[in-house]
Each structure stands twice: as C-alpha cells, then as structure tokens.
Amino acid sequence: MNHLGDYDVIVIGAGHAGIEAAHAAATLGARTAVFTMSLDAIGNMPCNPSIGGTAKGTLVRELDALGGVMGLAADATYLQSRMLNKGKGPAVHALRVQTDRKRYHEYMKHALELTPGLAIHQAEVVGLEVENGRVKGIVTQLNGEYTVKCVVLATGTNLGGKIFVGDAWYASGPDGMHAANALTESLKAAGLPLRRFKTGTPARVHRRSIDFSRLECQPGDPDNELQPFSFMTDAPMHNKVECWIAYTNPETHKIILDNIQRSPLYGGMIEGVGPRYCPSIEDKVVRFAGKDRHPIFVEPCGENTEEMYLQGASSSLPEDVQNAFYRSIKGFEHIEILRPAYAIEYDCVDPTSLEATLESKVVRGLYGAGQFNGTSGYEEAAAQGLLAGLNAARNALGKEQLILPRHTSYLGTLVDDLVTKGVMDPYRMMTSRSEYRLTLRQDNADTRLTPIGREYGLVQDDRWTKYQHTQNILEAERRRLHDAHLRTADLQAAMTAAGLAPAAEGGIAEELLRRPEIHYDLVAGVIGWGEGITPMLAERLETEIKYAGYIARQDRMIREVARHEKTLIPEDFEYADLTGLTLEAREKLARIRPKNLGQASRIPGVSPSDVAQLSIALAAHT
C-alpha cells in the first residue's frame, strides 16, 4: 500500500451529491478531496436532462440559499424554463428547466476545479479503513492509501451497479461507467446495513427520426416571466428550445403486454425495489390497465447534440421490443434508438442507520448522501450532499454539526423522513410530504436558510451582501404597502382598466392586496412600484399578504411542535423497561434511537399513546 495523502474530508463520487459535498466541505476550510472514477463523469446527468420540478425546484432554491452550486449551474446551462403548477396555490409552484447536459457537466467540473482547498482525484475507491468503529482512511484500486477524518459516500447507482436489458445483464454503472463492486464488500464488512434498489431510464433517440408535426409542442414560459434558480442570478433569461409531447396507444400497450415476461422485472431477474413515483412504461401499462394512453415528453439533451430524451418511457424490455413499442407511437414510426432504455440495480444503505446529520450510526465519521441513502433524483441528492459535506467538515474541524428540523425546509423534511421513517423504495421529494409547505415556498428559501448558511460558514460575503440588500428592499416595501392609501377614484379606474368590477371604495394597499382579484401590479399602477421591487419580489410579497392568516396558523403549529423537539432523549435511554409501550414501539425506538420526543412521534408504529407514555418516562428520568 502506498500512502499518498492526508485529508480532513474525502468525498467518494462526483455526481450531484458529491459535487455539493466536496464544495461545501472545502468552502468551510476543511482539507478536502473528491474521488471519481472518471473526471468526464463529474455532474453527469445519466437520466433526465433537467433540474427542478414539483418540490424539487424548492430543494434547488434551498440549496442555493445555503450556498450550494446546483442553482447557479442550472441558470448557466438551461435550454428551456417553465414554472409548473401556476394554476394552483403558491405552495406548490415549482421551477423546472431543461438543461444542456454536456454544458452542465463542464460547468460543474470547472466549479470544482476553481474551489480553493479542494483536490480532485480520478481513481476508484475500493475500500474503507475502519478502526474502533470510526473511519480512518480509504484505499484506491491502484493501492493508494489516504488517511482521513471523515468520508462522504456519494456513490449514486455505481455501487454494485448491474444493468438489465431484457434477459441480458452486466455489471455497470450508468452511461457505461464500470460498477464499484469492491467498495460494496468493504461497506458490508464494516457492518453497514445495505439493500438493493433499482431505477431505470428511457431510450435516447435521434432527432431526425421524429416527426414533430405529429406531436404536441410544449413551449417554455414567456421570456419576460422567466425566473432563475439562484438568488445570485441577475442576467436576463430567454428560452432556446421547445419540448414536445407524444402519447402511447392501445397498440403500444399490446406490444408491451405480449412481451411482459421478457422484462427482467417481471421475469424475476431484478431483485431491487424500483421507484414508486417514476415507474417504467411496462409498470404503467400493467398497473393502469384502464388507461388508453400515457404521455411521453420529448426533450433535447443539449444544443450541440441530436439526442432526444423520452421522459416517461423508461424500460428494461429487450431491444427488439423497445424498437417495436416506440415505433407504434404516433410521430415515432421511424425512430432511431441511439441508446437503449435500461434498468439499473444498485446498493444503498438503510437510512434509519444514519443520524439527522447524515453521519452513520455504525461507522463514525462516515456520511451518506444521495442514492446511497435511498433517494432518487438529482435535486434530492445535491441537497443531501451539501448537508453531508458541511457536517463532515465541521466534524473534522471539531465544530457543532447542523441539523435542519422539518419546519425549516424541504431538505429538513427529506432528512427527517429518511432517518426517522426509513424507505421501502427510492424516496422522491413531494410537496405532500411537508406539513408546512405554505411556509416552505421556493420564493422565500433565502429568508429561511441564508442566515443559517452564513452562521455555519457556507454563505460567502457576496451572497450575504445581496441577501441583506434584498431583505431591506422587501421590508421597505412591506412598510410602504402597510401605510399607502389608494383613493377610491384611482382604485376604481385601475380596476376598470384591468377588466375588473370596480371596488366600492379605496383603502390601504396591504388590505386591498388580501383580495383574490387584486394583484400587486394593479396596486403599483396607482401608487408606483416600490424601489428595487422586481416581478419576482412582487409575487413573493403578494403571497405573504394574501396567505397571512394561513401562514400564521402554520407558524403556531411549528411553535407547538418545537416543544416536543426540545424534549431530548438520552442516547442510552432504555426502552425495554417501558412496559407501557407497545412491543412494536419499543423495538422501533430502540433501533432508530430518536434524538427527541418530536422525532419519536414521527416513527411509523409509534402511536400517540406511546408518545404520551414516553413523555412521562422522560420527565421521570430527568
């Protein structure tokens, strides 16, 4: 073995989780290295060429507010931008962009190269060195040894990766990368509770083989309505491409059903559990037998490639069946498949074996992020990566680690779900998972999280200065709207011009904005736009005012829950002695070892009566 270096933090993997982990750790001043099997795979998008979406867009904004990289990268490399769910309430508005996957990789690679204090190594990590229950080093395929204080595992689908297409399978990571099998054995030897999950991806096809005249066009939002992901992005935005929608049909479904036993999933070859909320096309046809069609979103992979991505049509059926069912779709009659669809099975950890800091309970100093923790999605991975990298660095530097409660963020909700409830299939963030989604909107992520990022060392001076400037603008406008009075004649004229029934009388701007039909631009047409107020900030202020009553109610809920969060449970608390608890509750509490009464109350199988008994026991214990 050749000793080659010593670091505070080593990150294994440079996908979406690994990038954020490495950047965060180095930004905090930890001596950091990131290891990847290929520099050409940094920030790779092996599945959909997009960032954001429902709930995921909020995660990206939260990442950015904390000082992460993903939002900036998405803004620099987007092709088309759309705000989803605009017809619904602001709690579920979600920014999503199509991304140039090659430019995204190049942006992220360069971002890591420019990060001070970060070393980048192309090498496969084949083992961990663990002593007395704590990680001490790593070993590479070339017999290189590095000593380390903390390690972040961000292995994606490479860990024990196995690809399936029909009855063919081979060991592999995504996009032709080789699988990391030796590391799996090292993790098992260290005692980590591993399991098998699987995911899939659709075919990539040649643009020239699609008859777009037979598809529905899906344009982006008007250029004057586009919003960036990053609170640091000021450059004007414009859409560069269009996306399209095709549909399966009964013939497509018949081809799939006639060949369903040739699917490795239905033929029993695949052991891993697949994602519930991103099923393969064969899953959709079987599970939703009453549906005559399913949409397929046709998305470009970049400006300088002819590859098109078929979102909604992932499959593990054999190539001949793929050719047949894709070509049965209107507009795809002459489709040319460049890369066949496939399923990939991989190793991940039971996330209930992790602390809320994302540190392993089994091996101290070892952190997990992304698909290793049982999640799916680039955004979920990146958000965990930032938290894991930050905490690994603070652990290595002897500083307090960060735990984000559920009420602070979607990231806090995601982590709490993972470590408290666990997962039975790849976890995807959704707005319905948060009980506080009206206060956890994508527009206020900076207010919620940038002060935390600053306190914990991630938010740099330029971001902090801009944050303070934005908050000053918002506060000044809140005061102005609270004081400004609109005369009846002026308000009636503005409403008539907007095609609205005129109000009976004028009033204070803030009170008028509580009405559903009155919007900021109408009020501003009378009293003028506030200094520094952009359409994006105007929408944010209007949401705060219109939903003030609901937001206040959620704030009261948060304060009530916080009381339980403050009731701490000693690490060595003995649940077996609490005969008032059900057997299931005792077993789950002893296994998960919640940090406080609030977390205990969210464990599946722990009832309100169990929580009440535990509360009494804790009071007696103190």
Regions found by a protein language model. Give the residues of each.
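Glycine-/small-residue-rich beta->alpha transition segments that form the dinucleotide
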Residues: 150, 155-159, 317, 330
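Conserved N-terminal/central alpha/beta ligand/cofactor-binding core
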Residues: 23-131, 142, 154-171, 178-183, ...
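Internal hydrophobic alpha-helix adjacent to the cofactor/substrate pocket in enzyme cavities
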Residues: 381-402
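Extended, charge-enriched "interface" segments that sit outside catalytic cores
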Residues: 433, 439, 445, 450-612, ...
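An anion/pyrophosphate-binding glycine-rich loop and adjacent beta-alpha core
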Residues: 38-40, 56, 83, 184-323, ...
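Beta1/beta-strand and adjacent pyrophosphate-binding region of the FAD-binding site
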Residues: 3-17
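A glycine-rich dinucleotide-binding beta-alpha-beta segment and adjacent secondary-structure elements
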Residues: 309-375, 403-416, 534-588, 593
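Core beta-strand elements of the Rossmann-like FAD/NAD(P) dinucleotide-binding domain
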Residues: 5, 141-150
